Every structure is written in C-alpha cells, then in structure tokens.
C-alpha cells in the first residue's frame, strides 16, 4: 500500500483535545532493528485499518518508528489502588496512545503501543517491554475475544531488536493494543484525589459521550453512568468466572469504564478447580483469587462512586446514599449473570433447583481438584452416554454418577432434550483455553530460540475454542505435574 494512502488514515483524536492535564504528548522512542512477528489481519479488516504491504513497513509502523499520519501520540495519566493501596500517580509508563482510528461506520478504536519507550509516568522504568509479556497478551487477549469475553484486542507484535534488562537481559518487543478506550477507574481517581472535580466532570462527560451517549438524556447522567459501569463490570466478571479466568491484578487502574478486560500481566486460567486459586507472584494474600473477583470488582466500583459524588448530588449525604444504592446493586446483578452463565455450562435454564445442582457439582470438582475446563467440556459427552472421559477426572466416581442422575431429572423437569442441552453446553464450555503451560512453552520457544511457531500454532487453535479439533487433542489436556504453572509474573 503506498505512502499516500497510509498518510490519510481516518484518525480523530478526541482524547488529545482534552486539557493537557489528562496526558503528556510524546512520540514513541524509535527502536534499532524492528521485525514484524504477528499482524492480526482479520482485526485490521474489521477496523478498516490499512496495512502496509511489506514486512519492513509493518515493522516500522507497529514499532512506533514511523507513526501513521493523523496520529497524535500521547501517554495518559491515571492513579490507582494497587492491592488496596492508593498510588496517586501512575499513568502510561511504557505505553503510547497513537490515537483514535475511526471506521467508516463511525466505530472508534484506541490504538496503543506498549513497550514504546519512556514517558513522564515511567517512574524510573525503561519504558520497554520484554518479549514474553507481549506474547502472553497477544495470545490471551485474542483467545478471550474468541471465547466471547469483552476484551482489548491484539493488532500486532514486533521484536525491537534491542535487549531489555530485568533480572536478566531479554529480547524486547512492542505490542499494538486496540481498545474501545483506555479510560480506567484510576483515571477518575487521579483527578478526584487532587480535588480537581472540574477534571472529574470533564472526564465523566467525555466517557458518557464516547461510550454511553444515551445517558445524556437521563435525569441524573452521572448516577446513570455509575450504574452503567457497574452493569458492564457485573457482566464481565460473570463471564470471567464461566471460563475459569483469573485476572491476577484487579487494581482500579486495570478496571475499564467500557467493561473490557485489560492488562494481562499475571493472568492465568484455572487448572484443577479451587475457588481460592491464585497465580500472581505478587498476590501474597490472595486478594485477587478466583472467587474474590466479584467482590473486588465491587470494591473498585465503590472507588469510582467516591470520585463521582459531587456530580451525583450537591448534597453530600444524598450523593452518598444514591451512590451506595447503585454500587450495592452490583451484587444482585452479578449473581444473576453468573447464575445464567453457569447454568449454560450444564445445559439448563436458570431456574432455582439448578442452584443446588451447580453447588454440588462444584463441590465434587473441588474435592477431586478436577480440571475446571475439561470437566465441563466432558459433561456433554457423558450425557450422551460416553462417561469415561469425565469419570477419569474424578477420584470419587460414584458421586459424579449420582450427580448425572440428578442432572437428568432436572433436565426432564425443564423439558429439555438431551441433544439441545449438549448443544448449549458445547457453546459455553470451551474445549481449548490458553492453558498456562502452553502459553509458557510458546514464550520459552520464542525467547530462548527465536521460534515463534508454537505461538502461531496456539493462536490458530484458540481461534475456534468451542470446536472439537481432534488433531490438537493434546492442547485440551491439563498439564502434567512437571508442566504445571504455579505462579505467574507481570514481567513488564
């Protein structure tokens, strides 16, 4: 594609038109020898994002060496509660937002480069990213999209040709992330903590206009905005729980206003079912354990509510009362979504008797530390008569046989055909997830041997997570004891 076409990309950088206190204007720091590794051509097509023709041009574009014409690179400022402790200034310490790309239908996409160099928010960091975390985010964010989970997306991965130094020298990389925006609860906290409620109002008006313009007609747009963010987060966390996803670092700076999953640093997927599962090496007290994710999301939303109080009502007492009522609504809404998601995993309608069935199944799984993903996937086969793959996952097989009988009674009560129940199960129980050991194997091959074939193969398999792919059966399997990943690291 020639330079003239590339130069007229339809950027409309609305965030850059906000006051300068919201960001630092800064260009990506060039890298020496960029090499394109992956380009998500399917996503580029959906966005109508024009790609250069040669690998060299792609590498220059997605490394940040030659930002597209029309972009206005900047680093966003935000604060955040990290593991419950407030940090008054964080911000994009290694990321640069190129701008907002707008498709012909008017859909707006943030395009951000991670690992693009130092900014004023780098806090003594080098602004770069090692290759490993870039591979992890590419694999997992695209898998999450295919699994039906709201998420940021991966557009490209570039090796920088430079080393970055952590505990050791590692190959560097730049990741291109696409999001509907990068506005976080922590963005609101930055201004509220400085008593800059003019900034909070500007940000709230901007977020409403960008994400939820219909709320401008509400009687109290700011209360409605808080309610909407609570709703999208309730839906998101319920979907995480359905697939056994553990984010690992649910700080307020990693909680989006849009309801998209963002920042895949120490994330992981549950192997053996245990609601207390934690993977992140820095989560010493299990704050962000699998089962705690809903309550942490609500805690984060209470932080957003605190920022919005002066906008919700001029009387502090009335503002608190209204905000509390909205945030308290998160619990029931989450439970409704979670129950529906989990019922779909066993092919039944979300009716009251199913609650006990679900509780019993999870208890049996917990007792056996049965693999979360495989147990649910094999339920469908067991229901149709092939119980062996399911029974192999459990220590006490009589319990699971007894459970299957109860399930069948409830199915009959709901008047659902077995085949229909199994179809529902297979649409909601993935055969393939980015298993932690497979992701680590892909990273090791790339970092140690410059071999990206395992990464590409894993991405290909995860493109169809709900389909049987017999030729890749080994990718369905839980890790062997020697392969098991017990801790994950942010790594950036």
From Swiss-Prot:
One of its GO terms (molecular function) is magnesium ion binding. The keyword GTP-binding does not apply. Its EC number is 2.7.7.-, 2.7.7.108. It catalyses: L-seryl-[protein] + ATP = 3-O-(5'-adenylyl)-L-seryl-[protein] + diphosphate; L-threonyl-[protein] + ATP = 3-O-(5'-adenylyl)-L-threonyl-[protein] + diphosphate; L-tyrosyl-[protein] + ATP = O-(5'-adenylyl)-L-tyrosyl-[protein] + diphosphate; L-histidyl-[protein] + UTP = N(tele)-(5'-uridylyl)-L-histidyl-[protein] + diphosphate. ATP binds at residues 91, 93-94, 114, 126-127, 177, 184, 263. Keywords: ATP-binding, Magnesium, Manganese, Metal-binding, Nucleotide-binding, Nucleotidyltransferase, Transferase. InterPro entries: SelO. Mg(2+) binds at residues 254, 263. Its cofactor is Mg(2+); Mn(2+). The active site is at 253 (proton acceptor). The keyword DNA repair does not apply. It is an enzyme of class 2 (transferase). Nucleotidyltransferase involved in the post-translational modification of proteins. It can catalyze the addition of adenosine monophosphate (AMP) or uridine monophosphate (UMP) to a protein, resulting in modifications known as AMPylation and UMPylation. Belongs to the SELO family. This is Protein nucleotidyltransferase YdiU. The lineage of its organism: Bacteria, Pseudomonadati, Thermodesulfobacteriota, Desulfovibrionia, Desulfovibrionales. The gene is ydiU.
């Amino acid at each position: 594609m020639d330079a003239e076409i590339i130069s007229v990309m339809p950027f409309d950088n609305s965030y850059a038109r906000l006051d300068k206190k919201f960001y630092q204007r800064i260009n990506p720091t060039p890298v020496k020898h960029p090499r394109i590794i992956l380009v998500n051509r399917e996503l580029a097509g959906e966005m109508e994002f024009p790609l250069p023709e040669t690998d060299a041009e792609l590498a220059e574009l997605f490394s940040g060496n030659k930002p597209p014409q029309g972009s206005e690179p900047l680093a966003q400022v935000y604060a955040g509660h990290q593991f419950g402790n407030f940090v008054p200034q964080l911000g994009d310490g290694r990321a640069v937002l190129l701008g907002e790309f707008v498709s012909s239908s008017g859909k707006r996409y943030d395009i951000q480069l991670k690992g693009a160099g130092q900014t004023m928010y780098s806090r003594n960091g080098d602004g770069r990213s090692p290759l490993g975390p870039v591979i992890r985010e590419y694999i997992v964010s695209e898998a999450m999209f295919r699994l039906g989970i709201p998420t940021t997306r991966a557009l490209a991965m570039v090796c920088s040709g430079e080393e970055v130094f952590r505990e050791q020298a590692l190959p560097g990389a730049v990741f291109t992330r696409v999001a509907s925006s990068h506005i976080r609860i922590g963005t609101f906290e930055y201004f509220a903590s400085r008593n800059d409620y003019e900034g909070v109002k500007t940000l709230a008006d901007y977020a409403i206009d960008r994400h939820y313009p219909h709320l401008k007609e509400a009687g109290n747009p700011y209360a409605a905005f808080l309610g909407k963010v609570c709703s999208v987060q309730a839906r998101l966390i319920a979907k995480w729980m359905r697939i056994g996803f553990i984010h690992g670092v649910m700080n307020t700076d990693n909680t989006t206003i849009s309801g998209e999953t963002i920042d895949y640093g120490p994330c992981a997927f549950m192997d053996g079912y245990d609601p207390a599962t934690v993977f992140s090496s820095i989560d010493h007290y299990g704050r962000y354990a699998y089962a705690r994710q809903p309550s942490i999301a609500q805690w984060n939303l209470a932080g957003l509510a605190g920022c919005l109080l002066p906008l919700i009502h001029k009387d502090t007492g009335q503002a608190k009362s209204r905000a509390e009522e909205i945030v308290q609504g998160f619990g029931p809404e989450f439970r409704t979504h979670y129950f529906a998601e989990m019922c779909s995993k066993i092919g039944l309608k979300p009716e009251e008797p199913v609650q006990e069935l679900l509780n019993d199944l999870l208890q049996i799984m917990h007792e056996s530390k049965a693999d979360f993903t495989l147990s649910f996937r094999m339920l469908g086969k067991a229901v149709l008569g092939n119980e062996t793959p399911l029974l192999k996952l459990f220590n006490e097989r009589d319990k699971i046989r007894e459970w299957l009988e109860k399930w069948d009674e409830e199915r009959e009560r709901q008047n659902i055909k077995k085949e229909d129940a199994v179809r529902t199960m297979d649409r909601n129980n993935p055969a393939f997830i980015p298993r932690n050991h497979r992701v680590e194997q892909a990273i090791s091959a790339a970092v140690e041997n410059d071999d990206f074939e395992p990464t590409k193969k894993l991405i290909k398999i995860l493109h169809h997570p709900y389909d049987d792919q017999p030729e890749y059966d080994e990718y369905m399997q839980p890790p062997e004891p020697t392969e098991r990943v017990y801790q994950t690291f942010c790594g950036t």
